Amino acid sequence: MKKKPCKWAVIVQIFLLYSVVGWLYEEILEVFIYRTGFTNRGFLFGPYLPVYGFGALLFWLFLDSMKRQKRFGRATPLAVFLGSMVIATVVELITGYALRYFGLELWNYDHYALNFEGLIALNPSVRFGLGGLLFLYILQPLFERLIARQPRRVLTGIAAVISLVLLVDFIMQL
């Protein structure tokens, strides 16, 4: 009988996977939509944006259980969409304030309609809501099936390496 994967190993892998997915999303926007060319969108060296990893973990923590809950009926995709919008917008606002505190500005929504202090805006919030649907209904179930096939030792080893790489990258940026 295969043991269930270690919870911290799954958390680390979810964090990295969606940090990379977020980085790819941002780069695709920069290169193909805004046509500003390639720029590393984050404050870390590697191809990942931790804000997306944290957002994905919060989606997983709050919305996945809500989506699966049978006691009060399962959440509708509309509820998941709205929950994703709220979570992502709050994460983006808090992250934006934290970055400003350290003298960094990695995004600015001043030119968007319905923005707040250039840190959040309706348009990106709607996109994050759609991203939450993609995450909870398509990407995360695929990822969970992939994880379930891996031996616990492999998952723990991968998570340890990921943690070390992220820690070294963060320390190098200080």
Regions found by a protein language model. Give the residues of each.
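Aromatic-rich, lipid-facing transmembrane alpha helices and their immediate juxtamembrane interface loops
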Residues: M1-L174
